[in-house]
């Protein structure tokens, strides 16, 4: 039987696999904000990125290792393909963290070996022990993944795993890379690995899965029953294609059904000991932060964190909940940090009051960021009678979202009505030469006119593919959150902003998206799964930290 830590280890890959969602690219400050919140959430491992991909990715992982890595905090992990170049860059990036891990991988399915890697099984059997041993010479904590394990030949898979453990791997990850398996199949795969790998007792079994068939969470829970003790997941289930297994769904399934899962940990069914180290009251805040910063909206009926997760429309359901919450609710909303608390802050409130409330909410801002957030708070307080925690969340998340800005919005002015053509006047500052230009455009509506004017000024070709707006809180004076996604050369960039004027919010969101596009094109990066491994060592970043 595989090594058992006595509970489930939560391995969060929001900053690596989650960021590979189209349009979910994050800047350094955003990654840091999410990493700090993941630490507050209580995840065991943060996979902070793929350091070899680009100098920017290296810097982000290194910064997280420096500022989030603590003796009593999460393990900081980086991803590396099975090549010395990747592994060396990964080690250098995570080295500042007291608790660090190198996560290296290679494909084991025949379809990947033939069509992607152009390698034989014999090649893989030679590469795995060599690269795991090299990684082990740098750090003690090594995770090895058999990419596309669920479609690999079982006997070959067992052989690869045995070699990886013998070379020093302490965690063996079994990915369902394309979300292909069903729960019974995935559970059997984990069970068979336990039975057929002689040295599996020297490593923790981890699972990683995608949601292409909507089965990722179910597969993971079946894996837990069969000995998996680390779950690789993302906040809100974001990730490539249909996404990854959702952290909040997995954690709350194990929390609510603890009496069922306890027996798989040799506990009494009524044991009160938690199955994970997650602070569940931080779940909602973490979900909103990731949604705001990535621009990926959570569907209203999403389990645990969706807007309707604790809403009841049916009269029968409403009556039952009023009489006894347990009639139709299996989770207390407060357990996941959901509350309607309103704070008595207004236009007369001072910096210390705002700072104190932000600290209570878990935000630790620098002096400069606090000054900026307070200025936005005062501006909002002049226009909005009642400030809520959601308003403060919107202010702070937008504060850290701002990318490196080539463009800054100076003026937004629109005119529209049922008897006039929507017209927008926009002034935009180019920070590279500090010049300011103004353009006027007509559109099908005020937002369309704003976007047309911005495109005239920015001269950055793109296609608007999504515009969405939602209210942060209730009331006529509520903040409106706008998310805009644009596409160029098959890459998607998102922008997010909040304002009581949704047209102004739309203009700011569009400028944020344009800045992301411009910033992204200044850097090049590689994909850990799709880029050729052949030249990885030759193309090692000569000085990745700069």
From Swiss-Prot:
GO terms for biological process: L-leucine biosynthetic process. Gene3D superfamilies: 1.10.238.260, 3.30.160.270, Aldolase class I. GO terms for molecular function: 2-isopropylmalate synthase activity; acetyl-CoA C-acetyltransferase activity; manganese ion binding. Residues 408-546 are annotated as: Regulatory domain. It catalyses: 3-methyl-2-oxobutanoate + acetyl-CoA + H2O = (2S)-2-isopropylmalate + CoA + H(+). It is found in: Cytoplasm. Belongs to the alpha-IPM synthase/homocitrate synthase family. LeuA type 1 subfamily. This is 2-isopropylmalate synthase. It comes from Prochlorococcus marinus (strain MIT 9215). The gene is leuA.
């Amino acid at each position: 039987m595989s090594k058992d830590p006595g509970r489930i280890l939560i391995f969060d890959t929001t900053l690596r696999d989650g960021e590979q969602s189209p349009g979910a690219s994050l800047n350094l400050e955003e990654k840091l904000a999410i990493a700090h919140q993941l630490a507050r959430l209580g995840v065991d491992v943060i996979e902070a990125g793929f350091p070899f991909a680009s100098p920017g990715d290296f810097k982000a992982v290194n910064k997280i290792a420096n500022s989030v890595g603590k003796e009593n905090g999460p393990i900081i992990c980086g991803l590396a393909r099975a090549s010395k170049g990747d592994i060396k860059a990964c080690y250098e990036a995570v080295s500042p963290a007291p608790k660090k891990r190198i996560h290296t991988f290679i494909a084991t399915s025949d379809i990947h070996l033939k069509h992607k890697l152009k390698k034989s099984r014999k090649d893989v059997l030679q590469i795995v022990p060599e690269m795991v041993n090299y990684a082990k010479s740098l750090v003690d904590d090594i995770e090895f993944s058999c990419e596309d394990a669920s479609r690999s030949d079982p006997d070959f898979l067992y052989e690869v795993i045995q070699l990886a453990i013998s070379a020093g791997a302490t965690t063996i990850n079994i990915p369902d890379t394309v979300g292909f398996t069903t729960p019974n199949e995935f559970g059997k795969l984990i069970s068979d690995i336990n039975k057929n790998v002689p040295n599996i007792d020297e490593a923790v079994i981890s699972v990683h899965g995608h949601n292409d068939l909507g089965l990722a969470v179910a597969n993971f829970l079946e894996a837990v029953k069969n000995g998996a003790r680390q779950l690789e997941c993302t906040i809100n289930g974001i990730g490539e294609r249909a996404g990854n297994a959702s952290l909040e769904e997995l954690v709350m399934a194990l929390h609510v059904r603890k009496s069922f899962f306890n027996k798989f940990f040799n506990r009494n069914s009524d044991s009160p000991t938690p199955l994970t180290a997650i602070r569940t009251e931080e779940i909602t805040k973490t979900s909103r932060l990731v949604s705001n910063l990535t621009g990926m909206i959570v569907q209203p009926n999403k389990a645990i964190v969706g807007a309707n997760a604790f809403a009841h429309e049916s009269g029968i359901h409403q009556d039952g909940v009023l009489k006894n919450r347990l009639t139709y609710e299996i989770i207390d909303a407060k357990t996941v940090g959901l509350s309607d608390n309103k704070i008595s802050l207004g236009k007369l409130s001072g910096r210390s009051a705002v700072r104190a409330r932000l600290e209570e909410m878990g935000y630790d801002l620098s002096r400069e960021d606090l000054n900026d957030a307070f200025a936005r708070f005062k501006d909002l307080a002049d226009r909005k009678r009642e400030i809520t925690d959601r308003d403060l969340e919107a202010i702070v998340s937008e504060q850290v979202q701002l990318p490196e800005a080539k463009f800054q919005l100076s003026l937004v002015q629109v005119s529209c009505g049922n008897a006039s053509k929507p017209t927008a006047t926009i002034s935009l500052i180019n920070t590279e030469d500090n010049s300011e230009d103004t353009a006027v455009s007509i559109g099908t509506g005020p937002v369309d006119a704003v976007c047309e004017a911005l495109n005239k000024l920015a001269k950055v070709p793109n296609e608007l593919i999504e515009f969405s707006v939602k209210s942060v809180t209730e009331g006529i004076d509520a903040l409106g959150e706008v998310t805009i996604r644009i596409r160029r050369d098959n890459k998607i960039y998102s922008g997010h902003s909040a304002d009581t004027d949704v047209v102004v919010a739309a203009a700011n969101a569009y400028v944020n998206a344009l800045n992301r596009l411009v910033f992204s094109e200044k850097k090049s990066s590689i994909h850990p799964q799709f880029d050729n491994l052949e030249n990885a060592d030759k193309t090692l970043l000569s000085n990745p930290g700069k």
